[in-house]
């Protein structure tokens, strides 16, 4: 009786369409959830309802998100609703990694379940190393970075080297990338490591080649829920389809109008063809917005309605009031920045808004410089989101490499990162000898060093350093078996000389690096198993998002980074043809590119809760050139009756004296 009342209580908080989605329990469901319509609330209510109706046990439900933060929030909400843990909630990568840990040997690739997941930077390093060995490749024309991007896109599409078709390798660059891709995969397998693309790629291979394993997971995950479906790539889409093909109890939640990650592999077609993929699917639209005012929603709807390839939906709100959209014309980008800085200063001084609830969302990174100057001049606290994230910092990656090589001695990338840090008299020549020896014999660098040490070809100093390092790595491996992760990592820091190296440097930078390592140790202390920490750090590096603790500073960030966030006041600068929509997107992708740009505009508009400013400049300095431009076509798509259009100089004359 208590459970039933609790069920009724949380259902009572849902609107009619939300309730319809939460009560839907059989067959495929596409939940089209517009910005600010409470999709997480619906997802968690649906999970709670399935459990309370005894349709599935918690561990038979799989909920997939794109970030660790979203997964954690979803898990906490389910627990708060029905006091239940045990639902499988995680990111695509974490769920795929979990399956591979249990099943990797069934792929017969020589991998074992102790594999490690390498970071984006380590992936690029490996590509660079392979390209260096290919003397006939023009690295100026075919850069390692570009080759790596192509390899990553192929993985997003679920394509191993053997599955690339003639159309995939039409261009000379693609043919070069295919050669590197083949070597890249071989190197990963030898090192017993995977990159992020491999997690879904090999999951799909596992399911295709082993129908009985697929059947096991289909039985295990009888109810599947996928958040942000519009952001899925082809590999993720295939994975979800295979898992759901038996019971067809799949609920995909998304908004095609917010699909803005095409440049990194997201395929908006996945959500647009849901009804074809799952015949007889139920479609429910969430259109009641709980975030923004009526004028903001009207602006967003009028802009996005110009896209042809979309599911029709219109956001609405019970709130009839709200400030009109301010559209401001400025003479230059400098004046635009000065106007925005002055307007924010006015809003804060008059105590209408707190600085931490104000954001400037730009289309491209080059736009931020003028705002930095304007805020420095006005003494307005601000932060630009986009610096190095914690797990990407040099010292953190060094310590992670030490841990990885201690756990997996075949991890070539980890070994090469730390082999001469601190200095051990092991230069490029010695490293090349090791690499060549290993490649010729199809063995890892660690094994190669052991064999080479027997030959005596290294100089005495290098010989002693390498012998000492290998002995320590063996000792650390043994210590991880018997001691706690935190104690072993402290030992590694001391034994390796890494901590001493930083302490002896005695600079502010070195002090900051030591502080970061101490913070890392605090994170490690929360884990009983070092493998769990390594996996956690790898997945965080891939999925880390901005924490919503803005303090007292104005936030400056890109529109892409702002997705999923909200602010009381939003400024959208640079709404000019060529800047937004981006000329590059128009040139490269035509109408498809324009529609993605319009979706980015829609995302920007719907970040605002109460007040929205859109600015454009008649001239802008772009890469040392003054460019004259016209207002963005997106501005013309916003109805006049919900806007106040003026120039920055008029505003200056009204509010400020210069």
Curated annotation (Swiss-Prot):
Keywords: ATP-binding, DNA damage, DNA repair, DNA replication, DNA-binding, Helicase, Hydrolase, Isomerase, Nucleotide-binding. It comes from Rickettsia typhi (strain ATCC VR-144 / Wilmington). GO terms for molecular function: 3'-5' DNA helicase activity; ATP binding; ATP hydrolysis activity; DNA binding. One of its GO terms (cellular component) is cytosol. InterPro entries: ATP-dep_DNA_helicase_PcrA (IPR005751), DExx_box_DNA_helicase_dom_sf (IPR013986), DNA_helicase_UvrD-like_C (IPR014017), DNA_helicase_UvrD/REP (IPR000212), P-loop_NTPase (IPR027417), UvrD-like_ATP-bd (IPR014016). Its EC number is 5.6.2.4. It catalyses: Couples ATP hydrolysis with the unwinding of duplex DNA by translocating in the 3'-5' direction; ATP + H2O = ADP + phosphate + H(+). GO terms for biological process: DNA replication; recombinational repair. This is DNA helicase II. Pfam families: UvrD-helicase, UvrD_C. Has both ATPase and helicase activities. Unwinds DNA duplexes with 3' to 5' polarity with respect to the bound strand and initiates unwinding most effectively when a single-stranded region is present. Involved in the post-incision events of nucleotide excision repair and methyl-directed mismatch repair. ATP binds at residues 36-41, 291. Signal peptide: none annotated. Residues 294-564 form the UvrD-like helicase C-terminal domain. NCBIfam families: pcrA. SUPFAM superfamilies: P-loop containing nucleoside triphosphate hydrolases. The gene is uvrD. Belongs to the helicase family. UvrD subfamily. Residues 12-293 form the UvrD-like helicase ATP-binding domain.
């Amino acid at each position: 009786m208590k459970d039933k009342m609790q069920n009724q209580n949380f259902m009572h908080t849902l609107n009619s369409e939300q309730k319809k989605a939460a009560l839907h329990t059989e067959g495929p469901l596409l939940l089209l959830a517009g910005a600010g319509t409470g999709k997480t609330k619906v997802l968690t209510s649906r999970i709670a309802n399935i459990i309370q109706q005894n349709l599935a046990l918690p561990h038979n439900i799989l909920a997939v998100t794109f970030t660790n933060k979203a997964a954690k929030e979803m898990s906490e909400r389910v627990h708060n609703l029905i006091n239940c843990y045990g639902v499988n909630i995680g990111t695509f990568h974490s769920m795929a990694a979990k399956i591979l840990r249990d099943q990797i040997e069934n792929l017969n690739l020589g991998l074992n379940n102790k594999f490690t997941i390498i970071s984006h930077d380590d992936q690029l390093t490996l590509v660079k190393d392979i390209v260096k060995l290919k003397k006939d490749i023009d690295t100026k024309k075919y850069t390692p970075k570009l080759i790596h991007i192509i390899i990553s896109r192929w993985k997003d599409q679920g394509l191993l080297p053997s599955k690339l078709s003639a159309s995939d390798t039409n261009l000379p660059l693609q043919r070069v990338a295919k050669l590197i891709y083949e070597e890249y995969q071989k190197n990963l397998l030898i090192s017993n490591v995977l990159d992020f693309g491999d997690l879904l790629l090999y999951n799909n291979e596992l399911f295709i080649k082993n129908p009985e394993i697929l059947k096991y997971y289909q039985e295990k995950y009888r109810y599947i829920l996928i958040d942000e479906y519009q952001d899925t790539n082809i590999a993720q889409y295939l994975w979800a389809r295979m898992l759901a093909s038996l019971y067809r109890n799949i609920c995909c939640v998304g908004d095609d109008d917010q699909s803005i990650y095409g440049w990194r592999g997201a395929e908006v077609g996945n959500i647009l063809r849901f009804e074809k993929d799952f015949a007889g699917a139920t479609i429910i639209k969430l259109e009641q917005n709980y975030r923004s005012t009526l004028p903001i929603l009207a602006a967003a709807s009028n802009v996005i309605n110009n896209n042809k390839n979309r599911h029709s939906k219109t956001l609405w709100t019970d709130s009839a009031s709200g400030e009109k959209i301010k559209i401001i014309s400025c003479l230059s980008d400098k004046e635009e920045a000065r106007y925005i800085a002055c307007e924010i200063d006015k809003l804060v001084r008059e105590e209408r808004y707190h600085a931490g609830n104000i954001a400037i969302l730009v289309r491209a990174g080059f736009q931020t410089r003028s705002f930095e100057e304007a805020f420095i001049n006005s003494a307005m606290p601000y932060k630009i989101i986009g610096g190095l994230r914690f797990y990407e910092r040099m010292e953190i990656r060094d310590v992670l490499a030490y841990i990885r090589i201690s756990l997996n001695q075949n991890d070539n990338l980890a070994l090469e990162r730390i082999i001469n840090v601190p200095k051990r008299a092991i230069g490029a020549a010695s490293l090349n000898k090791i690499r060549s020896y290993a490649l010729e014999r199809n063995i890892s660098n660690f094994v190669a060093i052991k064999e080479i040490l027997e030959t005596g070809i290294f100089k005495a100093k290098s010989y002693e350093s390498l012998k000492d390092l290998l002995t320590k790595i063996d000792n650390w491996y043994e210590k991880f078996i018997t001691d706690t992760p935190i104690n072993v990592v402290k030992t590694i820091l001391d034994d390796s000389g890494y901590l001493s190296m930083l302490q002896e440097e005695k600079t502010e930078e070195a002090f900051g690096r030591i502080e970061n390592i101490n913070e890392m140790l605090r994170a490690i202390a929360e884990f009983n198993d070092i493998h769990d920490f390594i996996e956690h750090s790898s997945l965080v590096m891939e999925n880390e998002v901005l924490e919503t603790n803005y303090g007292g500073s104005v936030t400056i960030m890109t529109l892409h980074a702002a997705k999923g966030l909200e602010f009381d006041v939003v400024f959208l600068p640079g709404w000019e043809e060529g800047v937004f929509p981006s000329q590059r997107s128009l040139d490269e992708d035509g109408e498809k590119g324009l529609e993605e740009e319009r979706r980015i505009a829609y995302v920007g508009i719907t970040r605002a809760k109460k007040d929205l400013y859109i600015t454009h400049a008649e001239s802008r300095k772009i890469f040392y050139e003054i460019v004259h431009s016209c207002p963005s076509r997106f501005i013309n798509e916003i109805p006049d009756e919900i806007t106040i259009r003026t120039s920055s100089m008029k505003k200056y004359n009204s509010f400020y004296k210069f």
